Amino acid sequence: MAFWGAPLDCEDHAERAMLTAKDMVALIDDLNAELDAEGLPNLNVGVGINSGPCVVGNMGSQSRFDYSVLGDAVNTASRLEGQTRNYEEWILMGESTVQYKPEWTKYVDSIQVKGKSELLSVYTLTNVAD
């Protein structure tokens, strides 16, 4: 999991997340070309991106804690990542992220995800400027 906006504000968090996802997919594509040349199976990656308020900080006990992030936006991103296997897209995003860079995205579907009573509009990444 990766996140932006904590501990310091990050106004371009959505753009950074989209560019990072694009770079991840490009690196996996390069690695898969090498694996193909070796006759080895390819790797797949699924990326779910969502934006929203979260609780961020050190969580756990004094003897063992992690700096982590919790909240509905995180859970939704996880659900989106899980849905990538149902589409021919390695990256799926919620509207809360898409609103920041709609020109970089295309609509994929409206889906039901666990923990949500209403349908979630899902988008993927296209036309990204570096």
What are these regions (language model features)?
Residues A6-V47, S51, D72-R85, E95:
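Alpha-helical scaffold within the catalytic cores of cyclic-nucleotide enzymes
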Residues F3-L8, P53-S61:
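Active-site loop/short helix in cyclic nucleotide turnover domains
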Residues A2, A33, Q99-Y100:
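Charged/polar, solvent-exposed surface patches and flexible loops
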Residues C54-V56, A77, Q83-D130:
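Cytosolic regulatory/linker segments at or just downstream of nucleotide-handling modules
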Residues M1, G46-G48, W90, Y123:
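Residues embedded in well-ordered beta-strands
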